[in-house]
Amino acid sequence: MNAPLSPKARDAYRLWQLCFGDTDAFLSSYFSEVYRDDCTLIGYTEGEATTHLQYLPVELSSAGERLRVSYVVAVCTHPDYAGRGLMKEELKTALILSQERGDVASLLLPAEDWLFDYYTKAVGYAPIPVAVTTTSLEAVLSESDPECEGVTLVEYLTAVERASKAPQLLHTPAIWRVVTEDYPTSEGYVLREHRTAEDKVNGALFYVEREDEVIVQAVYGSSAVREVLLQEPSHSAKKVSYYLRPEGGRGVGEERRGMIRLLDPLRFLQHLATLHPDLRGAWAYSDELFPALDGLYIVEGGVVRRTAYPTSHAYPKCRTTAELFAQLGKSLGEELSYSLRLFFEAV
């Protein structure tokens, strides 16, 4: 039996359901497994809960290197109070609290296209590739995962993500439990497991069947396991689309984008320098929300250091995450990207 919700959680639950229409079954699972009062912001207007967001503590992983980050979910304003500019201050507060918690960056998936511009202008988020949509089955089969097994589906999914060297946002076991419980309960949403002869899970498939299209949102497993799992959707008479991780899907389909906002550029750059020892550069970085981060960031020989903000114009000026990412993309020869899927986003 679920523990009673706190007054704050009850307000969060009601506002989430009012704005997004999610079922009691999903919300009960989410609020039991994932929700935390200390990761939730609710704004009140004359005693009425009017704004809501949650900034979940998760990890960003690349080649086994991990960074603490926040993932922002369920950003919403009560319909009767929309258009009053209430959310901007809540987003700023979430970023400040995330930084105080030790998060290196904040990520989110805008629910609608117009929100990309809003999040950029409001608090400095930058768009990044999080997936590529393709119709190429060959491309999906070439994107294999490490060999992993789990007694349960959640155990397998947690293990295979952490074994992968792909740049990605990692699910916690609690988030995986909510995702795997809820996914097959929605109309047209299908979840399949692949098991070994010893009845261990070693693959999983998530896809959505629509009236005129099948969308494979995620598939996990070796190439051989993927081939077995994908037989069902690939034989459909409908158009079949597949989501690939962005770094492996370049040039084979249409990019899907999420957003990222740096909170600690020094630690983020050190993360990149560890992964890319040949990365070199110096950038004059400034941050309107976090002026203490202003400075000249120098990367060389796998080491990052920060000095005082330069008075000369000899260095590229980066006033936002987007501008710094553009400079890093030039230095690395490719755009930075992180796989982000099955985090409660709409398909």
What does each model-identified segment do?
Residues 1-57, 64-71, 138-175, 210-214:
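Short amphipathic alpha-helix that is part of the acyltransferase structural core
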Residues 91, 98-111, 236-246:
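Conserved GNAT acetyl-CoA-binding A-motif
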